[in-house]
């Protein structure tokens, strides 16, 4: 057994029916780790005890195509052309205002012959062959294809040269003597900018990176041979690259960026053993399911990742399964024979991963059994991400400066061009690497911050915290009736904190009265009980001084005060108040958050467009129920864009999301009308949280629902014009300012709307944040609908202005404020509340 067949030995566990193990009608896949990843021995872990438990159903995994082709982008978006319907930018979508700046990108030209074409053939076999490998072997045996550049995925054949006939018939014979008729039918002549060609180019480059000894994990490629170890936290970082080939404004370009994969030097068996010691046996299996199902593990022998969908406690390593050839072998013997690995725990359960078929294949998913001691956990746990020192250690290794990033990119291109196999692959298809793309961007002017008593031009455009000292906010509500709930050992901190809070509040124009202080035991139940007893309807705000950052404290308080008893709440850690040296800045931050939660306004910027409503939409999955989608909708309700209407809805399908947006928009328009006695003249919606391949759904389902909500608000709504902008923070493009033979981060306010953008979209990139360390990331904006017909300069400038209006930070952020508000709202609901917040809080930024 060799190659992929050796990697994937399939069979059925003896003594288990298909119903019992939850397998599909197809064979079982078995995988393992490589030799040396596990210590040989006959010891037994503390979890090695028999459990008479059934197999849970799991919640499904990623599709089989995603498993095999995770690096591919979702090429459905290549067919979504929105610019042609936007008449005001059909001929030109670039702006002109701002100071020109010379930029270097992480894009590289790919040169093709002028008359280059790709020929696509549909291949059929009679009789049909189930084995993809056999289909490829029989086809490639024919001399008609021997001297041609070719690629075959089992159904479609791609050639760089056209065959003589439109339909070509070939005959092959298998080793068993069976005659197979192969028919090749020309289906398409493809040009370089066609979606199929773009997908094809990406396949070629994935193959090239594999030739450079990189391994594909998820969407990206990594070098396990060059790990960066962080031993104090038992972590390994694999350096690698995210890549993509696409057709930009007028060129085919190769896009690459440096990426790191975080791996834990801890197996699932190690994790289970530690969990058992911490929780005890009574709830061990339940906790295993809760903490492991949904995680992604790596089997290091083939550097492939799998999602844990279930844990089967009834299957042990000593049990046998049936291989393809019909023989039976135990898991123990299989790993020993194939990889010289001795399993150390013979009573460990097996992890179950479900691999679904292709998108249009309705068959049941294929089931994979994995050995816990051979599976390494990937990524960082929530506990790890809250560890400041750990995250700092990771950041020190992964945050590359612009110069360091450029050096890594240059090395990648050099490796491709120097590698004979990679170079031959490119030349075979007529591809040649060109120069790195340089272009001219523009830097838009910085903004003035408008306060109650004066206007300030920040000394440092990205942060105006120092400029706001002793300045009054635009408006605030006095806080007279409020509670502080704390444990006994935090009592001595309260007076000093209150004194500081009232002092900074007064200087801001936020009057803070003396609260009612309630002391409780150090348990989540005690805090919640005190709030339930003392939280009468007249209470304006509840502050809880929490003894620790245990999630159950925060979750129980936020859930009760966001939904069951709607009152704005503020949670503060005791250790935060213990830092006397930072008390002033802590009190200022808290005073600003409390002002917003009571309906106050902190600052604004000049908005030339009158009667403008801006909307931010974001979605995420609920942390407890992954089938539930949390939709956050935040809309401005006044002309200076300082007051907000916030709504959060829980849904299950894309159609439900579109329907709920109509309800949310109607509520926002009604709230605007109540506040302004008229409907807005313009609405600009910023839609965040759009994954790859979802752009078409947003355009076809969500935009019509938003339009319908506007038109159904009455005759006045006919003059209300709508724009919808899709926002993406995680884009592959990087920009570097080129100065004096070196590179650095571009200036704040840099806009790119040519050469690195897409010809079929009205899109642009904007840098609205700074990076003190590392390389700054631009945010991508794609205007998919625009009744407002705003000029590119105006749309770009408005977007930049909105990045100044996030009240949880006295500075610029990477996305427009309504998007960040929607993100904060969905995160709170998805992680802590798990149900829709009360509409009584909709007029306040209660989630800051």
Curated annotation (Swiss-Prot):
SMART domains: PAZ, Piwi. Residues 267-379 form the PAZ domain. This is Piwi-like protein 4. GO terms for biological process: cell differentiation; epithelial structure maintenance; meiotic cell cycle; piRNA processing; piRNA-mediated gene silencing by mRNA destabilization; regulation of translation; secondary piRNA processing; spermatogenesis. Detected in male germ cells beginning around 14.5-15.5 dpc but is absent from female germ cells. From 15.5 dpc and until birth, it is present in male germ cells. Not detected in somatic cells of the embryonic gonad. Expression declines soon after birth, reaching undetectable levels in 4 day-old mice (at protein level). Belongs to the argonaute family. Piwi subfamily. It holds the Pfam family PAZ. Keywords: Cytoplasm, Developmental protein, Differentiation, Meiosis, Methylation, Nucleus, RNA-binding, RNA-mediated gene silencing, Spermatogenesis, Translation regulation.
């Amino acid at each position: 057994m060799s190659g992929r067949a050796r990697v994937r030995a399939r069979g059925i566990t003896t003594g288990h029916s298909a119903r019992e193990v939850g397998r599909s009608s197809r064979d079982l896949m078995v995988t393992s780790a490589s030799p040396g990843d596990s210590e040989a021995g006959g010891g037994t872990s503390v979890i090695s005890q028999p459990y008479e438990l059934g197999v849970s159903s799991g919640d499904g995994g990623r599709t089989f195509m995603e498993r095999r082709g995770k690096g591919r982008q979702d090429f459905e978006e290549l067919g979504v052309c929105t610019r042609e319907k936007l008449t005001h930018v059909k001929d030109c979508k670039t702006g002109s205002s701002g100071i020109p700046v010379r930029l270097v990108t992480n894009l590289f030209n790919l040169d093709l012959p002028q008359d280059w074409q790709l020929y696509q053939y549909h291949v059929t076999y009679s009789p049909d062959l189930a084995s993809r490998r056999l289909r490829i072997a029989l086809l490639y045996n024919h001399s008609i294809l021997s001297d041609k550049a070719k690629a075959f995925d089992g159904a479609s054949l791609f050639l760089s040269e056209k065959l003589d006939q439109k339909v070509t018939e070939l005959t092959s014979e298998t080793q068993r003597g069976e005659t197979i008729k192969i028919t090749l039918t020309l289906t398409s002549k493809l040009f370089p900018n066609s979606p199929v060609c773009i997908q094809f180019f990406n396949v070629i480059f994935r193959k090239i990176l594999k030739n450079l000894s990189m391994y594909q994990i998820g969407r990206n490629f990594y070098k396990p041979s060059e790990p960066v170890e962080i031993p104090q936290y038992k972590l390994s970082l694999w350096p690698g690259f995210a890549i993509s080939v696409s057709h930009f404004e007028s060129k085919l370009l190769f896009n690459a960026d440096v990426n790191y994969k975080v791996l834990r030097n801890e197996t699932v068996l190690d994790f289970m053993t530690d969990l058992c010691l911490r929780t005890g046996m009574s709830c061990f299996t339940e906790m295993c399911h809760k903490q492991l199902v949904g995680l992604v593990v790596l089997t290091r022998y083939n550097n492939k990742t799998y999602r844990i969908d279930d844990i089967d406690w009834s299957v042990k390593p000593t049990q046998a399964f049936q291989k393809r050839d019909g023989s039976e072998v135990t898991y123990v013997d299989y790993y020993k024979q194939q990889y010289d690995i001795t399993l150390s725990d013979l009573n460990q359960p097996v992890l179950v991963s479900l691999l679904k078929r292709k998108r249009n294949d309705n068959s049941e998913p294929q089931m994979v059994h994995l050995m816990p001691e051979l599976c390494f956990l990937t990524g960082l746990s929530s506990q790890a991400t809250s560890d400041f020192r750990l995250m700092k250690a990771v950041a020190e290794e992964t945050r590359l400066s612009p110069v360091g990033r450029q050096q890594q990119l240059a090395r990648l291109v050099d490796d491709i061009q120097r590698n004979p196999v990679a170079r031959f692959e490119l030349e075979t298809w007529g591809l040649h690497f060109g120069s790195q793309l340089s272009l001219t961007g523009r830097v838009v002017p910085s903004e003035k911050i408008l306060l109650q008593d004066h206007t300030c031009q920040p000394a440092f455009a990205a942060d105006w915290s120092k400029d706001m000292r002793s300045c009054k906010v635009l408006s605030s509500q006095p806080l007279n009736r409020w509670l502080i709930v704390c444990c006994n050992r935090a009592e001595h901190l309260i007076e000093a904190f209150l004194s500081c809070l009232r002092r900074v509040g007064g200087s801001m124009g936020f009057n803070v009265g003396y609260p009612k202080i309630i002391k409780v035991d150090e348990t989540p139940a005690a805090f919640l009980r005190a709030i339930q007893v003392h939280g009468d309807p007249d209470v304006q705000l509840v502050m809880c001084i929490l003894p620790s950052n245990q999630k159950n404290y925060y979750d129980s308080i936020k859930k009760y005060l966001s939904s069951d008893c709607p009152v704005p709440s503020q949670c503060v850690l005791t250790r935060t108040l213990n830092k006397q040296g930072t008390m002033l800045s802590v009190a200022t931050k808290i005073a600003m958050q409390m002002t917003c939660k009571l309906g106050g306004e902190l600052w604004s910027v000049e908005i030339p467009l009158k009667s403008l409503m801006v909307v931010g939409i974001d979605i995420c999955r609920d942390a407890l129920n992954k089938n539930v989608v949390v939709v956050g909708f935040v809309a401005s309700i006044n002309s200076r864009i300082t007051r907000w209407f916030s709504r959060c809805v829980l849904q299950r399908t894309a159609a439900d999301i579109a329907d709920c947006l109509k309800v949310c928009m109607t509520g926002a328009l009604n709230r605007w009308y109540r506040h302004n006695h008229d409907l807005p003249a313009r609405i600009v919606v910023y839609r965040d949280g759009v994954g790859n391949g979802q752009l078409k759904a947003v355009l076809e389902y969500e935009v019509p629902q938003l339009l319908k909500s506007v038109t159904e608000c009455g005759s006045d709504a006919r003059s209300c014009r709508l724009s919808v902008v899709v926002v993406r923070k995680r884009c592959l493009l990087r920009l570097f300012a080129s100065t004096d033979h070196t590179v650095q981060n571009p200036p704040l306010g840099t806009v790119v709307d040519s050469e690195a953008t897409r010809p079929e979209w009205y899109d642009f990139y904007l840098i609205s944040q700074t990076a003190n360390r590392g390389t700054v990331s631009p945010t991508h904006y794609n205007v998919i609908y625009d009744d407002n017909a705003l000029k590119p300069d105006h749309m770009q400038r408005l977007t930049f202005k909105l990045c100044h209006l996030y009240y949880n930070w006295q500075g610029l952020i990477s996305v427009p404020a309504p998007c960040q508000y929607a993100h904060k709202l969905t995160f709170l609901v998805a992680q802590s509340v798990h149900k829709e917040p009360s509409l009584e809080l909709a007029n306040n930024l209660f989630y800051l």
